[in-house]
């Protein structure tokens, strides 16, 4: 509500002005003052604002005193309901943030409860013949809320002690639901809907839910039936998620490192790539992290230092087929291997077997997910299979990237296949659903917060994944149905019904005990209207009355104690802030209801429609809306639900007057337009029942064309949405331009590098790189393997940049869809407001929407040129070069170290011949090389070879090894061994070893152990 103070303070001020706060005899109230009293109480009952604990503690004693005086002065149901149930009604409005210093916040609440149940308040109730045993009275609320607070304190104490360190070696871990269940026990049903309870449920979920995947990862690491590599990968996931460096304690880091070292030592050597092949293929950042940790036997080592040669964990297809290296039930624990398999399309037998095994593994996981009915079951199905939160993200990105590449390739040429294979489909299904499950798990609980998160997440699935879901073989709403079985909210809706029934019971009691004018209790109308609106707005439910009577509607005037002239005369006195009110007897007459709606509600309707969408104007309109809602609450029923509609409008508009007001959206605007349309129907129906001679003009149906308020609201919503779209597109444009610039720069660098003259240096396995002109000095001399490695690095850099660009383009296409929808809505609004002063503003926004859509499409087209085809433009021959080099390198390794050298040497010769023939064919069609300046070529060479050492230019082709060891000074060490071919000294048999080595005496293991034992025995 647009008030200087909140509703609680406003009620205190209003009652204090009417009744005074001195302990004197209660003054008698005139009818006008009685109406003000009832109106003030109804306004408090209908208010939707909140109050802080401190303010409630300050105001409660005063309000309790004034409520008792109000009952003594009026003996109305309104005052009785307020005085007897004030504790619960105030607690319902308490806003308590448990996030910071939970224990202090609990103590604050206990202080408030003691104030509510204080002796003076209880005495005042008893002294005025009011009950202290009301369901929402001080006694019952003190009992229920204090018990809940004690329970909450205990839960938070356990949560504070439940840390990764304390639970790592725990024999039993509590189910996440066991923490929240005590807080939603049936004895707390009356306070379940209260905001401080809902906030408590939210904070418990936030602090506890991590335990579920944590416990499953610990279980996977400790499972002795799993392969050592699988267990090590589980432990790495555990470290990354719950014991990261910087937050983990030193003790836990040492213990985890010791566990990890012991585990890694049991991994079979066949799980590693040989040293000679570690740089044969590029690695992802996560693969580097995994390999570095396992090779160094330390989970906190995340990379290998530059220049260091280290083993790496295999990620080829064959490792996925080995049951001895990877447990079949948790293949996805080795996410990098699965990702590499899914991102390729190799047709060989090993890859086919691996894809079949991965597909079977993921299919079993998918079936378990679909059969799961609780969060525990679905998370267990994911984590035990290796689909941790991190791994789901990795595999989802791989499938999305591969699908996007397929689509772009299919669009670039006819006859292309743009479908995913079965392994990619089923892994994609598990990864996407798993990612959503882990996101939902962060807030899963029995409260309102999880309902909001769940509905928001589900509603964004289709727009985010779009065509991918159908490509994965999922039916429409398939993901939603799968998640619904296990992750759907399970709120205690019967508690909401119980709370309403309790309010209804209290209203019946006070209505029987007191006598008020008319046939309708203002307290009943206002309180139940407030509760029903709250239930529908927050929980999305409509709770029927226990008597199941149909909604009251306006009926034709058939009989009345008063003539039409009397009713018309009384209605003419109805206006906002009017000093002269109609007689109470006429207001109580049911025949007066249409007149009241046709005047009071019509005034409020016109006030909001004609107000500008600004703080001052809307604030004034809200005052009129509140007056219309509260007027005649004790006399006129909530016919056609007009009070509920007014309450909904007030609640929808009020947030825009706050300091941290939300940005209005199209959903806000459409919702308010619909509410005003419903209110218009009520007003039109009321006007139709008034005699024609006194009938006021029927207002136009509210629309953006006829309402200044709606036009301003829609205009603001459209502008803010456009502003957001422009900002996001600008940010995305910068990313795309930066990525595209990097791709083009790398392509240009490689193009210039290969336009240099490259000459072999015989005997050194090196090449000289010259500028294009024959007379120029060379840029330098490098080993051939370093040149190939440098070219491969730049090529892989381009591939990574293209993957980033592809992801940005997918996001851009989503923005294009959003912009197109925004354009259509803006165009429709411009048409509706044509000819009005707002029409020009909407047309201006329409122009900006069109410009944005054009810019987005142009950006997508230009970025797509770098994504068409399997290679970046200009890199086809570079890829061919690297593939040929790789093929020759593999055959050379086999020929020099294989068990059947003759066969491998023949294969090497055939490979060389095939490559040579291809090169000769390509030379015939090679266009003339472009001319570049020496400076441009030099910069290209510097970028590629700047990090590699040059080969020295001297007469000798090789250097001999020296017997230098135990180095004290590097000055006498022959460093040429690092740059040249090595020649063995003549006195060393390089095949059978040095004969003198066989005649030497060596220290045996048994002798060494005996010496150690002797040392320890002598010290005893």
UniProtKB/Swiss-Prot annotation:
Keyword Repeat tagged: no
Cross-referenced Pfam families: Herpes_UL37_1
Transmembrane segments: none
GO biological process, one term: virion assembly
Keyword Cytoplasm in annotation: no
Protein name: Inner tegument protein
InterPro entries: Herpes_UL37 (IPR005655), HSV_ITP (IPR034738)
The organism's place on the tree of life at top rank: Viruses
Residues making up the signal peptide according to the UniProt record: none
Cellular localisation: Virion tegument; Host cytoplasm; Host nucleus; Host Golgi apparatus, Host trans-Golgi network
Keywords for the protein's UniProt record, in alphabetical order: Host cytoplasm, Host Golgi apparatus, Host nucleus, Virion, Virion tegument
């Amino acid at each position: 509500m647009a008030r200087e103070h909140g509703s609680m303070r406003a009620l205190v001020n209003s009652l204090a002005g009417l009744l005074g706060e001195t302990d004197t005899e209660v003054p008698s109230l005139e009818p006008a003052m009685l109406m003000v009293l009832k109106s003030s109480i109804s306004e408090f009952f209908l208010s939707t604002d909140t109050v802080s604990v401190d303010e409630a503690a300050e105001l409660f004693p005063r309000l309790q005193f004034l409520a008792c005086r109000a009952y003594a002065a009026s003996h109305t149901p309104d005052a009785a309901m307020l005085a007897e149930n004030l504790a619960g009604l105030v607690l319902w409005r308490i806003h308590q943030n448990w996030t910071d210093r939970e224990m202090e916040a609990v103590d604050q609440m206990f202080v408030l409860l003691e104030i509510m149940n204080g002796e003076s308040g209880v005495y005042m109730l008893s002294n005025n013949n009011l009950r202290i045993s009301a369901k929402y009275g001080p006694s019952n609320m003190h009992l229920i809320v204090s018990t809940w607070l004690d329970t909450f304190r205990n839960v938070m104490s356990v949560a504070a002690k439940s840390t990764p360190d304390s639970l790592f070696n725990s024999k039993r871990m509590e189910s996440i639901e066991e923490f929240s269940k005590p807080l939603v026990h049936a004895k707390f049903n009356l306070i379940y809907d209260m905001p401080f309870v809902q906030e408590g449920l939210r904070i418990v979920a936030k602090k506890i839910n991590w335990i579920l995947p944590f416990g499953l990862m610990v279980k996977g690491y400790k499972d002795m039936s799993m392969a050592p590599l699988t267990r090590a990968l589980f432990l790495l996931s555990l470290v990354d998620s719950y014991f990261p460096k910087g937050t983990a304690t030193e003790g836990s880091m040492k213990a985890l490192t010791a566990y990890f070292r012991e585990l890694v030592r049991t991994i079979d050597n066949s799980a590693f790539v040989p040293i000679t092949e570690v740089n044969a293929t590029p690695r992802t950042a996560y693969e580097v992290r995994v390999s570095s940790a396992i090779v160094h036997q330390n989970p906190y080592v995340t990379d290998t230092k530059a220049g260091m040669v280290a083993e790496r964990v295999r990620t080829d297809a064959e490792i996925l087929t080995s049951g001895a290296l990877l447990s079949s039930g948790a293949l996805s624990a080795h996410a990098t291997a699965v990702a590499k398999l899914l991102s390729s399309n190799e047709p060989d037998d090993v890859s086919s077997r691996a894809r079949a095994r991965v597909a079977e593994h993921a299919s079993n996981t998918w079936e378990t997910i679909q059969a799961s009915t609780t969060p525990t079951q679905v998370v267990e199905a994911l984590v035990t299979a290796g689909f941790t939160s991190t791994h789901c993200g990795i595999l989802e990105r791989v499938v999305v990237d591969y699908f996007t590449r397929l689509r772009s390739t299919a669009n670039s040429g006819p006859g292309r296949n743009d479908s995913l294979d079965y392994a990619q489909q089923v892994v994609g299904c598990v990864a996407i659903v798993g990612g959503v499950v882990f996101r939902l798990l962060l807030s899963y609980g029995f409260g309102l917060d999880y309902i909001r998160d769940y509905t928001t997440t589900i509603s964004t699935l289709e727009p985010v994944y779009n065509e991918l879901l159908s490509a994965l073989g999922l039916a429409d709403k398939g993901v939603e149905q799968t998640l619904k079985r296990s992750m759907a909210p399970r709120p205690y809706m019967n508690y909401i019904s119980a709370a309403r029934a309790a309010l209804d019971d209290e209203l019946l009691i006070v209505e029987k005990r007191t006598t008020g004018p008319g046939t309708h209790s203002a307290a009943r109308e206002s309180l139940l209207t407030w509760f029903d609106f709250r239930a529908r707005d927050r929980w999305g439910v409509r709770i029927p009355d226990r008597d199941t009577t149909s909604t009251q509607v306006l009926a034709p005037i058939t009989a009345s104690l008063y003539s039409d002239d009397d009713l018309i005369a009384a209605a003419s006195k109805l206006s906002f802030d009017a000093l002269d009110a109609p007689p109470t007897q006429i207001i109580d007459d049911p025949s007066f209801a249409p007149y009241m709606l046709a005047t009071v509600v019509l005034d409020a309707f016109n006030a909001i429609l004609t107000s500008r969408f600004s703080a001052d104007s809307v604030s004034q309109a809200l005052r009129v809306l509140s007056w219309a809602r509260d007027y005649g609450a004790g006399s006129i029923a909530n016919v056609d639900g007009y009070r509920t509609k007014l309450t909904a409008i007030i609640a929808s508009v009020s947030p825009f007057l706050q300091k941290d007001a939300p940005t209005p959206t199209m959903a806000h605007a459409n919702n308010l337009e619909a509410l005003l349309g419903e209110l218009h129907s009520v007003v039109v129906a009321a006007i139709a029942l008034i005699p024609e001679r006194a009938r006021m003009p029927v207002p136009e149906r509210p629309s953006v064309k006829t309402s200044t308020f709606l036009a301003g609201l829609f205009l603001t919503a459209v502008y803010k949405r456009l502003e957001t779209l422009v900002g996001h597109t600008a940010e995305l444009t910068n990313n795309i331009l930066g990525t595209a610039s990097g791709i083009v720069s790398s392509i240009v660098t490689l193009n210039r590098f290969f336009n240099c003259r490259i000459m072999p240096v015989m005997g050194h396995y090196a090449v000289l790189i010259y500028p294009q002109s024959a007379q120029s000095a060379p840029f330098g001399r490098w080993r051939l393997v370093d040149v190939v490695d440098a070219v491969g690095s730049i090529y892989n850099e381009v591939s990574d940049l293209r993957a980033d660009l592809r992801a940005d383009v997918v996001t851009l296409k989503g923005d294009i869809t959003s912009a197109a929808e925004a354009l259509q809505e803006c165009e429709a609004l411009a048409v509706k407001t044509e000819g009005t002063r707002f029409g020009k503003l909407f047309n201006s926004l329409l122009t900006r929407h069109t410009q944005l859509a054009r810019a987005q499409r142009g950006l997508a087209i230009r970025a797509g040129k770098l994504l068409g085809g399997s290679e970046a433009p200009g890199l086809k021959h570079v890829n061919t070069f690297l593939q040929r080099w790789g093929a020759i390198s593999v055959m050379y390794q086999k020929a020099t170290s294989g068990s059947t050298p003759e066969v491998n040497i023949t294969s090497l010769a055939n490979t060389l011949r095939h490559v040579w023939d291809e090169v000769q064919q390509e030379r015939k069609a090679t266009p003339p090389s472009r001319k570049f300046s020496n400076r441009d070529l030099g910069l290209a060479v510097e970028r590629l070879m700047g990090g590699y050492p040059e080969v020295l230019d001297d007469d000798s082709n090789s250097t001999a090894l020296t017997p230098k060891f135990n180095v004290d000074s590097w000055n006498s060490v022959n460093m040429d061994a690092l740059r040249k071919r090595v020649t063995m000294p003549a006195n060393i048999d390089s095949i059978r070893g040095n004969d003198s080595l066989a005649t030497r005496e060596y220290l045996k293991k048994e002798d060494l152990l005996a010496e150690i034992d002797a040392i320890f025995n002598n010290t005893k």
